[in-house]
């Protein structure tokens, strides 16, 4: 039962990361000044 909780936690974390990636891409497309540095780093991450 404990293993299931770990799997659920990992799935939730992965979903959040994917969501963040989507938001980052949107911000980068709009060329928001605050995100420009993060976008430069984000280019190297597929």
Curated annotation (Swiss-Prot):
Residues passing through the membrane, by range: 6-26
Domain of life: Bacteria
Sections of the chain in a coiled coil: none
Signal peptide: none
Compartments, as annotated in UniProt: Cell inner membrane
Any one of the GO CC terms: plasma membrane
HAMAP family given in the database record: MgrB (MF_01596)
Protein name: PhoP/PhoQ regulator MgrB
Upper lineage: Bacteria, Pseudomonadati, Pseudomonadota, Gammaproteobacteria, Enterobacterales
């Amino acid at each position: 039962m404990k293993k299931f909780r770990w799997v659920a936690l990992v799935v939730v974390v992965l979903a959040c990361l994917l969501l963040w990636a989507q938001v980052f891409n949107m911000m980068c497309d709009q060329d928001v000044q605050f995100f420009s540095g993060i976008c430069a780093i984000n280019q190297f991450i597929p």
